[in-house]
Amino acid sequence: MKLLHIKFFTAILFSAALFSSCDKLETDPVGVPELENYYYAGFFSIPWNNTATASVLRNQTALIKFPVKFHSSYLRDYDPSAQYALITTGITNPAVVGQDFEVVDKSGNKITSSNGIYALVFPKAETKIDTLYFKVLNNQLPGTRRIEINLVTNTTQQYTVGTFSQAFKRFIEIR
């Protein structure tokens, strides 16, 4: 009988703890003032991680494409931009912009950076998928070259475009 009381009491305590620890969390940023002008951009491709590599031949004529998804809960009267940088730190034999490849638009026209930062604009902060384009320049130097492309946080007075921890980095390997 005493064992039955202990089991019953334990069950009541467990149930009370279970129900009292439940808390409704609001995960949708809509209506949270500090997040109303905060957006996210991430590479939109499989795998959803930071290891994806486009491995191409140096004489490839087709543009290299990396789709980027912009996440927003609102339409705005301004045009936020996701920013990206080309990283060579820690890369042996890095690819060189202007020598091994160029950053281009979808028509193949060269895009210039501002202090090493490139921008991908999302008009009216509308959720959509756009693309980063790269053109291989057929450099005849021997060896495989590699470059890292990182989406970086862009903070202005009007908005912030952040990145995801698992979808902000891609690589190009030119063979």
Where do the language-model regions lie?
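Sec-dependent bacterial lipoprotein signal peptides
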Residues: M1-C22
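Bacterial Sec-dependent N-terminal signal peptides
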Residues: A16-I46, F164-F171, R175
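Beta-strand-rich interaction surfaces with strong enrichment in secreted/lumenal proteins
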Residues: T53-S55, I117-P123, L137
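Short, solvent-exposed loop/turn segments enriched in Ser/Thr/Gly
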Residues: Q60-F66, K128-L132, G143-I147, A167-F168
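Contiguous beta-strand segments of beta-sheet-rich domains
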Residues: Y78-I91, F101, D130-T155
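Short proline/glycine- and polar residue-rich coil/turn motifs
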Residues: N109-S114, L120-K128
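Short, exposed beta-strand-loop hairpins at the edges of beta-sheets
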Residues: T156-T163
